[in-house]
Amino acid sequence: MATFKLIVVSAEQHIFNGEVKGIQATGSEGELGILAGHLPLLTAIKPGIIKITLEDDTEEVIYISGGFLEVQPTIVTVLADVAIRGKELDRERILEAKRKAEQNIVSGAKDASYEMLVSKLSRELAKLRAYELTDRLTQRKR
């Protein structure tokens, strides 16, 4: 299967730079599957995960807080505010942040709008999904 170059960068650092067979992400208009030779595209991406299929058919997961995805004939670039490899996520920290976000929604925290609170909870749930998917992929390798 043909490959293409994928670059994933956050505001702080380069997260991924290499040849891949494909990626899956959630764009502003729905789910995207990108393979080599995809037509050019520029789209906003929603907070969630990017699932990468590497050259050796292994998979990697990256949490994305949102951003943009650009597809060119031989290169795909993901520009994200925050991007964290699934293997670098800390389950306990995610669960604690999720618990706090849920408490803030229930108590109606005065320092934030309801939409901001729900957005925070959604980001933590996406991180948890990235962690769990990475954990499953890691167990499959064993």
From Swiss-Prot:
Q: Name one GO molecular function term.
A: ATP binding
> What is the topology of this protein in the membrane according to its UniProt annotation?
Peripheral membrane protein
One GO CC term, this protein: proton-transporting ATP synthase complex
**Which cysteine pairs are covalently linked by disulfides here?**
none
Alphabetically ordered keywords of this record: ATP synthesis, Cell inner membrane, Cell membrane, CF(1), Hydrogen ion transport, Ion transport, Membrane, Transport
Query: Which cell locations does it reside in?
Result: Cell inner membrane
Protein function = Produces ATP from ADP in the presence of a proton gradient across the membrane.
Q: Name it.
A: ATP synthase epsilon chain
Organism ancestry? Bacteria, Pseudomonadati, Pseudomonadota, Gammaproteobacteria, Pasteurellales
